């Protein structure tokens, strides 16, 4: 009897769970409580086999429960299996209960690839998305690297690993050949310094005219004149090395020593001397003008091109100072002092070769080459290391094979010259092996040099191509700015970016509100 009572009680308790609870009014009548007011009523808020309606960035689709059940660990799979509306709302950005539609403020292009993933089980990389943005989207939807298709996995991993190491850590280049926003921001900060400066607007225009050949017509004319002066200076330096001018200079020096005059008696050709003075005057005008117009004197002396300009005129003034000092301290030793002064002049004249680098201010290729060398120090270091190891090894082998022969292989340091020439495949032919073992060592040295030099050179060449394309893209962006001035273009880029971002957000919010308010007006979504 007791057993029956216990069983009956247990049966009543279980049965009571299946009967909806009711409330008793004042007359004693029972009325059922609505499902929404019953906590944990156990009635599902949507059928588990019902298709899932989603709206991702304005793209509406309906995904079948069977397709989502194949991937329960994804965000949409967990959304399909959500036990309550509150749990589902945690997985989406918004939910329209009237239409039964879930809204996600995410990239619609990636969502189309996500649909393909639910069909085939493989995810393909989108070229229009940055590798990091693609990874963020994949993480948001609950997809791992294992979901990537075999045809895209290697490319994705290579791009993801290479970008931070090559571009971010070393500050080499951005991910594309588009103009770099960091460089534009640097120019903006420089231009902003003129706002509080005296005659800031005029100084800014003059500075842009001298620094940017594509800024205006006067800047193009100034650039052409500057290039012409540089070429004339280089031509004068080359002409001065001709034998007839060297003989003229030597005769003048001898006449000076015989006459007992000071160093002022040595004179170059009058035409070349006047041309040199004109070039120095122009270079001095450029340096002083850029220094006076520069927004920051500290940044001026840190810029490589400005340092090249200073070095190009420094030898002339150092020569003048040396001549003045020599002329003021003559005590009957004119010949010896003249000899020392001639050596100093030769050294300073040799420094004039740096004027060739002034063309980098007007050449995209030279600037790209400088940027490539700046950001390829690792590759250059690897190249030098490979050459040092190869030269050391093959020089020792050549010394062992050729030390008995009188062919210039007397010591290992003497063999380093031969090893360097051979590994770089130059082959002057001044020192050659004659024994069979020496020839075999030379063959290995040449073949090893081809392999060793080719590996880093390829990487450096790829970087140069990237920098060159990026520089050309930046110049094209300046040229295609139309009637707007360059500083207006630069000052508006940040504002345009922020405005575009705000407009995009407003459009996204308006599109989402319109989607939620009038879902019936949209076309019937497809079921996947």
Swiss-Prot record:
It is a multi-pass membrane protein. InterPro entries: BTB/POZ_dom, Ion_trans_dom, K_chnl_volt-dep_Kv, K_chnl_volt-dep_Kv5/Kv9, SKP1/BTB/POZ_sf, T1-type_BTB, VG_K_chnl, Volt_channel_dom_sf. GO terms for molecular function: delayed rectifier potassium channel activity; potassium channel regulator activity. Residues 1-217, 294-304, 363-377, 469-528 are cytoplasmic. Residues 519-528 have a biased composition (Polar residues). Residues 497-528 are annotated as: Disordered. It is found in: Cell membrane. Residues 240-270, 323-341, 400-412, 433-439 are extracellular. GO terms for cellular component: nucleoplasm; perinuclear region of cytoplasm; plasma membrane; voltage-gated potassium channel complex. Belongs to the potassium channel family. S (TC 1.A.1.2) subfamily. Kv9.1/KCNS1 sub-subfamily. This is Delayed-rectifier potassium channel regulatory subunit KCNS1. It comes from Otolemur garnettii (Small-eared galago). The lineage of its organism: Eukaryota, Metazoa, Chordata, Craniata, Vertebrata. The transmembrane segment S4 functions as a voltage-sensor and is characterized by a series of positively charged amino acids at every third position. Channel opening and closing is effected by a conformation change that affects the position and orientation of the voltage-sensor paddle formed by S3 and S4 within the membrane. A transmembrane electric field that is positive inside would push the positively charged S4 segment outwards, thereby opening the pore, while a field that is negative inside would pull the S4 segment inwards and close the pore. Pfam families: BTB_2 (PF02214), Ion_trans (PF00520).
């Amino acid at each position: 009897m007791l057993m029956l009572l216990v069983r009956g009680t247990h049966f009543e308790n279980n049965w009571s769970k299946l009967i909806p609870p009711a409330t008793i009014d004042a007359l004693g009548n029972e009325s059922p409580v609505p499902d929404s007011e019953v906590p944990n009523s156990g009635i599902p808020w949507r059928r588990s086999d019902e298709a899932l309606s989603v709206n991702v960035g304005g793209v509406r689709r309906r995904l079948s429960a069977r397709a989502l059940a194949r991937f329960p660990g994804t965000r949409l799979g967990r959304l399909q299996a959500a036990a309550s509306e509150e749990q589902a709302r945690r997985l989406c950005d918004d939910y329209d209960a009237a239409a039964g539609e879930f809204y996600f403020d995410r990239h619609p292009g990636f969502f189309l690839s996500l649909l393909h993933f639910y069909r085939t089980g493989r995810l393909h990389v989108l070229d229009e998305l940055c590798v990091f943005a693609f990874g963020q989207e994949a993480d948001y939807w609950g997809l791992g690297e294992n979901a990537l298709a075999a045809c895209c996995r290697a490319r994705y991993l290579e791009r993801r690993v290479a970008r931070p190491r090559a571009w971010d850590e070393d500050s080499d280049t951005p991910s594309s050949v588009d103009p770099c926003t960091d460089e534009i921001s640097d120019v903006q900060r420089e231009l902003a310094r003129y706002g509080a400066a005296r005659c800031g607007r005029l100084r800014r225009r003059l500075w842009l005219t001298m620094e940017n050949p594509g800024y205006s017509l006067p800047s193009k004319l100034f650039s052409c004149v500057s290039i012409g002066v540089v070429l004339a200076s280089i031509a004068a330096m080359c002409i001065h090395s001709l034998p007839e001018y060297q003989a003229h200079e030597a005769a003048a020096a001898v006449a000076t020593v015989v006459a007992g005059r000071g160093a002022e008696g040595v004179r170059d050709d009058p035409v070349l001397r006047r041309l040199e003075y004109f070039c120095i005057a122009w270079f001095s005008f450029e340096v002083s003008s850029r220094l006076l117009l520069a927004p920051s004197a500290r940044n001026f002396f840190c810029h490589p091109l400005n340092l090249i300009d200073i070095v190009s005129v420094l030898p002339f003034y150092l020569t003048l100072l040396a001549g003045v000092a020599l002329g003021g301290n003559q005590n009957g030793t004119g010949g010896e002092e003249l000899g020392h002064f001639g050596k100093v002049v030769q050294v300073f004249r040799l420094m004039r070769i740096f004027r060739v680098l002034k063309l980098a201010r007007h050449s995209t290729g030279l600037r790209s080459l400088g940027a490539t060398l700046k950001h390829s120090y690792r590759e250059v270091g690897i190249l030098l290391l490979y050459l040092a190891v190869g030269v050391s090894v093959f020089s020792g082998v050549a010394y062992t094979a050729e030390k008995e022969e009188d062919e210039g292989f007397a010591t290992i340091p003497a063999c380093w010259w031969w090893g360097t020439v051979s590994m770089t495949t130059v082959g002057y032919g001044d020192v050659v092996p004659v024994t069979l073992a020496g020839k075999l060592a030379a063959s290995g040295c040449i073949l090893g040099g081809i392999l060793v030099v080719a590996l880093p050179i390829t990487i450096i060449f790829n970087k140069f191509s990237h920098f060159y394309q990026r520089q050309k893209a930046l110049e094209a962006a300046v040229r295609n700015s139309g009637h707007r001035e360059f500083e207006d273009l630069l000052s508006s880029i940040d504002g345009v970016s922020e405005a575009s971002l705000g407009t995009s957000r407003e459009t996204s919010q308006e599109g989402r509100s319109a989607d939620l308010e009038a879902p019936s007006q949209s076309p019937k979504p497809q079921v996947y």
